[in-house]
């Protein structure tokens, strides 16, 4: 399929002019990949950190989407993995943000292919479209300051520059790459002299002492055709293979699914290595509004409100005689109490607890590797399992029976299905359920129940305008999620 055909109906992806500016609107490209290991147990492979609420009630992804909305911005384009597409759509809907599109990567290939795919897609409607590459898992407290910085860089980007945003450093950081800013070329915009790899401590101290050097946040503003030209010059293989995969992309339930076999042939590479470090037309805008990649629990602690002793508390948490400690309870049933702790992070969830030296929380990744080696489900899966129709939570799992809380979004439906090894009992506790059991269809309201015999073809739907919640009791010889035969599914699951 030609890209123009794929994009039919997407003409609002880039508007020509904002009433507040002579520049074209900027299309945010929200990069929503990531495996979610460094902030375990809250972030996991099935639900990585960008979708979790670390610093407020909304997720990092939602905060990123809000940060690049409003005057000067077009509707966003989100790039995400297959398993996260419905999470992205749901979280944007909760923000009241209608995306221009959601592009599905069959597998993660790092940021260069994702950026190339977005540029090719945007160029179909407007080759000179301004696009802002935004990692969806960063924290930027001052949203207006960031928007102002983006608008400062927009004239340079419109003239054919690739504009990055250098973060004013607050410490001699060895965990980030750095940028060297050169002479000013436009108001607030400097030529970029070079990218600097993550330094050792001595070099970081030298960089921190010199005002020319900034942190590299991986944020880029450019025209679509400018980025495509940069790929043509510096990484033509990535561009050509991405173009082939995009030309074979197919619409799927409102998403755009990149061709999986062709996408698997694209070289996995970061956009910094593939293009930016070699390009000669890169500029930098200094950003002083505060930024963190939230790459560790220590970073979460640094960005969180603290008491007079440096303690950051979240959920049902209490600190007694503690200093510089992060205590976070993610369960309404767990009271987390720290006594006499210093420089500690403790995160309690219903199925897992992390206790670590706050300054060594980068080692969390090693802990996840250990859990994976043991095939512990907590390494990958949250207690709450998110699905296209809503979510469920396992309350009790014992020999031959299981109890779940199931939440179904308004208008959503589970697949028409049957089970070989279990029967089920459903009790509605909120909302209205439309229930199919073999040839019978009926409505259930609060406190009503139904029995699903083993082997019966069944489905639950929420025909109402409010969430439907029910308790499901399963009984049988095998209770795994793979005991399912699907006959119909509105989300095209097999």
What is each stretch, according to the model?
Residues 31, 134, 428, 473:
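Catalytic metal- and UDP-sugar-binding loop of GT-A-like glycosyltransferases, i.e.
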Residues 142-263, 283:
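Conserved core of the sugar-phosphate nucleotidyltransferase
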Residues 131, 212, 219-220, 292, ...:
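A residue-level structural signature of the nucleotidyltransferase/glycosyltransferase Rossmann-like core
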Residues 470:
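Noncatalytic nucleic-acid binding interfaces
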Residues 21-25, 226-427, 432-450, 458, ...:
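Left-handed beta-helix
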Residues 16-30, 37-135, 139-145, 151, ...:
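Conserved N-terminal catalytic core of the sugar/cofactor nucleotidyltransferase
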């Amino acid at each position: 399929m030609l890209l123009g055909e794929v994009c039919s109906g997407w003409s609002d992806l880039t508007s020509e002019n904002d009433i507040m500016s002579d520049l074209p609107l900027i299309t945010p490209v929200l990069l929503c990949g990531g495996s979610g290991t460094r902030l375990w147990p809250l972030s996991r492979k099935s639900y990585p950190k960008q979708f979790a609420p670390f610093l407020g009630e909304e997720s990092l992804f939602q905060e990123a989407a809000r940060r690049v909305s409003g005057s000067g911005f077009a509707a966003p384009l989100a790039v995400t993995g297959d398993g996260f597409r419905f999470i992205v759509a749901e979280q944007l809907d909760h923000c009241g943000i209608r995306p221009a599109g959601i592009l599905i990567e069959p597998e993660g290939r790092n940021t260069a292919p994702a950026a190339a795919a977005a540029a090719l897609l945007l160029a179909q409607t407007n080759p000179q479209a301004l696009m802002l590459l935004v990692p969806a898992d960063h924290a930027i407290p001052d949203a207006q300051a960031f928007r102002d910085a983006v608008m400062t860089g927009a004239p340079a980007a419109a003239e054919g520059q690739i504009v990055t945003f250098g973060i004013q450093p607050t410490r001699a950081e060895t965990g980030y790459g750095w940028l060297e800013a050169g002479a000013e070329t436009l108001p607030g915009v400097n030529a970029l002299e070079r990218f600097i790899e993550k330094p050792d401590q001595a070099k970081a101290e030298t960089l921190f002492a010199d005002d020319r050097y900034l942190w590299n946040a991986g944020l880029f503003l450019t025209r679509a055709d400018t980025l495509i030209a940069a790929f043509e010059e510096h990484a033509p293989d990535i561009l050509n293979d991405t173009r082939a995969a995009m030309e074979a992309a197919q619409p799927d339930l409102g998403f755009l699914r990149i061709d999986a076999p062709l996408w698997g042939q694209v070289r996995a590479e970061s956009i910094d290595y593939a293009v930016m470090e070699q390009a000669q037309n890169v500029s930098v805008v200094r950003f002083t509004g505060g930024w963190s990649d939230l790459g560790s629990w220590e970073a979460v602690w640094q960005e969180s409100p603290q008491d007079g002793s440096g303690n950051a508390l979240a959920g049902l948490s209490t600190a007694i005689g503690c200093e510089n400690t992060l205590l976070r309870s993610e369960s309404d049933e767990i009271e987390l109490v720290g006594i006499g702790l210093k420089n500690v992070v403790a995160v309690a969830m219903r199925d897992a607890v992390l206790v670590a030296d706050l300054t060594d929380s980068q080692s969390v990744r090693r802990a996840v590797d250990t859990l994976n080696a043991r095939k512990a489900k907590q390494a990958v899966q949250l207690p709450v399992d998110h699905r296209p129709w809503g979510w469920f939570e396992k309350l009790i799992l014992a020999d031959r029976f299981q109890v779940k809380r199931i939440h179904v979004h308004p208008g959503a439906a589970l697949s028409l299905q049957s089970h070989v090894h279990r029967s089920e009992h459903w009790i509605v506790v909120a909302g209205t359920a439309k229930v199919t059991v073999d040839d019978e269809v009926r409505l259930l309201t609060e406190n009503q129940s139904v029995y699903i015999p083993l082997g019966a073809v069944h489905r639950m739907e929420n025909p109402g305008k409010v969430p439907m919640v029910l308790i499901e009791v399963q009984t049988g010889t095998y209770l795994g999620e793979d005991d399912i035969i699907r006959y119909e599914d509105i989300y095209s699951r097999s």
